[in-house]
Amino acid sequence: MRAPHLHLSAASGARALAKLLPLLMAQLWAAEAALLPQNDTRLDPEAYGSPCARGSQPWQVSLFNGLSFHCAGVLVDQSWVLTAAHCGNKPLWARVGDDHLLLLQGEQLRRTTRSVVHPKYHQGSGPILPRRTDEHDLMLLKLARPVVLGPRVRALQLPYRCAQPGDQCQVAGWGTTAARRVKYNKGLTCSSITILSPKECEVFYPGVVTNNMICAGLDRGQDPCQSDSGGPLVCDETLQGILSWGVYPCGSAQHPAVYTQICKYMSWINKVIRSN
């Protein structure tokens, strides 16, 4: 007697695929990340931040273009991730609550279905960093379905005031850790940085930084690098900036990083989220 055949409808097949796809993607990412070079052990690891405590950055998002790590981002709503506009508006995969490129530790995988770039953003070409002195460098990404909020995944609070010079803040990322060659950390690295005044920033980047940008850095060797583009600047557990651009060498205390200042864009962010 023949065993009965199982027939799957198109709908049930799609549901099964949707359940399997996140696991498959995670396995492929792990295989891809395993090929990334290890950190340079000749360098002082304390000079480039330290590993973030597990689950301490539940708003952190890694954005992938296929299997390639593309940019960082931050969860600002159950259905929305904020990142830098220069990361491009192609469909991406978002790993929300991610703190390790190799391990699955409670993050949630979502496809982005829509991108909303700030209407005044135009990729520029400045005198210091060609194509990296862009004003209004913000983009909101809508997730295919809302994330489930909990201890490992939660939205970062938007600012009720602007950060002030001297404020101590934190950045986290998987970015380059040495100027000699580009490489990624597998684990999320946290670094402490200080908000600079506009006058201090002008010394480093004369005539380049606008009132919609904010500089932070100067703590020894802890500036984030360009491969952390789109990552959050967090001050007192509120979002104050999105990493827009900086100057090589990575980890150089001589050049602060430049962020899009989130407090200047609250109306736009809230309008996009409410209307979509």
UniProtKB/Swiss-Prot annotation:
A GO-annotated cellular component: extracellular space
Subcellular location: Secreted
Gene Ontology biological process: protein maturation; proteolysis
E.C. number: 3.4.21.-
InterPro entries noted in UniProt: Peptidase_S1_PA (IPR009003), Peptidase_S1_PA_chymotrypsin (IPR043504), Peptidase_S1A (IPR001314), Trypsin_dom (IPR001254), TRYPSIN_HIS (IPR018114)
Annotated glycan sites: 39
SUPFAM superfamilies linked to this entry: Trypsin-like serine proteases (SSF50494)
Ranges for domain Peptidase S1: 47-274
Catalytic residues identified in the record: 86, 137, 229
Gene3D superfamilies documented for this protein: Trypsin-like serine proteases
Molecular function terms, GO-annotated: serine-type endopeptidase activity; serine-type peptidase activity
Tissue specificity remark: Expressed in breast, ovary and prostate.
Disulfide bonds: 52-162, 71-87, 169-235, 201-215, 225-250
Signal peptide start-end: 1-30
Predominant location category: secreted
Keywords: Cell cycle, Disulfide bond, Glycoprotein, Hydrolase, Protease, Secreted, Serine protease, Signal, Tumor suppressor
Family statement: Belongs to the peptidase S1 family. Kallikrein subfamily.
Entry function: Has a tumor-suppressor role for NES1 in breast and prostate cancer.
Record protein name field: Kallikrein-10
